[in-house]
């Protein structure tokens, strides 16, 4: 989601600016575009086959038998992790082989490949960086419809719920994260987060000065793992 032409995205030039800039005036995504050295495909190859989402601890990454180019990639990812830890964040570096879908998801899938917002009871942001593979996508709030506001979807969930459309139903929607998922409006174009760009995006929390950033993980294809940093 390049900052160019995106009123909800602000582009920054450094990590310090990314960390310190406050969300305001409708801007709910900050992007530090950059290039990083190294061979990230080699890192994935050395990790070998896997399933689902595999967290990569520092020791495993350092222990990989890599060429100098692969080592540059590994050290760049480890440096990003340490940078976030130094600022009291809890990053996780993952090799995403595939996003596991809930077979009992029901009427509205609520996995990360559906456009959604992140929520928290207190002020907190989501940090994202894709090093290799398909990247996450963002969707302008103006280009999105809350899925539970779409009559046919709401009716289907209400039938699944088996009760009345009242306060208890609203609580049911919240408990199952149905109120966090969105559908693109006709003609809307999702915007890619890109490779190597470090993003800080707004979540939904009480008192937030801006709407949360709507985003999703990409569909994973067999044989195309991703390297993703998230906090």
What are these regions (language model features)?
Residues 111-192:
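Catalytic core of non-heme Fe(II) oxygenases with the double-stranded beta-helix
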């Amino acid at each position: 989601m390049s900052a160019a032409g995106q009123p909800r995205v602000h582009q920054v030039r450094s990590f310090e600016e990314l960390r310190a800039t406050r969300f305001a005036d409708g801007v709910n995504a900050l992007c530090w575009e950059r290039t990083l050295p190294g061979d990230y495909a080699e890192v994935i190859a050395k990790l070998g086959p896997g399933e689902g989402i595999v967290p990569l601890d520092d020791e495993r990454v350092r222990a990989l038998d890599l060429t100098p180019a692969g080592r540059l990639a590994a050290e760049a990812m480890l440096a990003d992790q340490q940078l976030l830890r130094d600022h009291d964040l809890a990053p996780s570096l993952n090799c995403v082989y595939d996003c596991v879908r809930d077979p009992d998801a029901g009427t509205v899938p609520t996995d990360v490949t559906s456009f959604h917002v992140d929520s928290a009871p207190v002020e907190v942001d989501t940090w994202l960086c894709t090093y290799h593979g398909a990247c996450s996508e963002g969707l302008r709030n103006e280009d999105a419809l809350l899925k539970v506001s779409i009559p046919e979807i709401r009716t289907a969930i209400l039938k699944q719920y088996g009760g009345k459309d009242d306060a208890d139903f609203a609580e049911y929607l919240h408990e199952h994260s149905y109120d966090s998922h969105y559908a693109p409006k006709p003609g809307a174009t999702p915007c890619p987060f890109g490779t190597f760009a470090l993003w800080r995006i707004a979540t939904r929390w009480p008192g937030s000065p801006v709407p949360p950033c709507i985003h999703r993980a990409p569909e994973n294809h067999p044989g195309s793992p991703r390297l993703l940093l998230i906090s």
